[in-house]
């Protein structure tokens, strides 16, 4: 099976549990003879350096210029569509929550729920925080959901 991972968490995190989870998952799937590729055209993540050659496609930046992370995410979404389509995966695993799908919309998709903190304790977050809404949109679009916490 060919499994593609998108750019989202690798654009957002330099180090972190979510990106480490996806790197370890990719390693384990590859060790079990699955074809795995992570597509993150521009990213700042350090965990991807631990992956075997060919599993990761992208360029690492030390950091994004101030106030440009959202621009890099939009750019990555557009630029990764072509390479994901050409690689022709069987499944795309979106690495975080977003309003729009990553990769071709006709592919089956998997989303991982990392926790339910925003839903359990909404009073702890700003009313402007859109995390719960993006999570709901992502889950509605998913064909399969993995819950890890």
Where would I find each of the regions flagged by the language model?
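Carbohydrate transferase catalytic cores enriched for Leloir-type hexosyltransferases
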Residues: 1-149
């Amino acid at each position: 099976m060919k499994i593609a991972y998108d750019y989202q968490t690798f654009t957002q995190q330099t180090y972190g549990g979510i990106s480490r989870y996806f790197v370890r998952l990719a390693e384990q799937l590859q060790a079990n003879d699955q074809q795995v590729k992570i597509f993150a055209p521009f990213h700042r993540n350090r965990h991807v350096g631990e992956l075997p050659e060919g599993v990761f496609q992208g360029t690492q930046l030390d950091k994004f210029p101030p106030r440009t992370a959202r621009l890099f995410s939009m750019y990555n979404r557009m630029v990764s569509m072509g390479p994901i389509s050409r690689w022709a995966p069987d499944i795309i695993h979106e690495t975080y929550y977003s309003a729009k799908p990553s990769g071709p919309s006709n592919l089956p998709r998997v989303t991982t729920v990392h926790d339910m903190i925003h839903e359990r304790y909404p009073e702890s977050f700003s009313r402007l925080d859109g995390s719960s809404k993006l999570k709901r949109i992502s889950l509605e679009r998913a064909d399969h959901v993995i819950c890890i916490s």
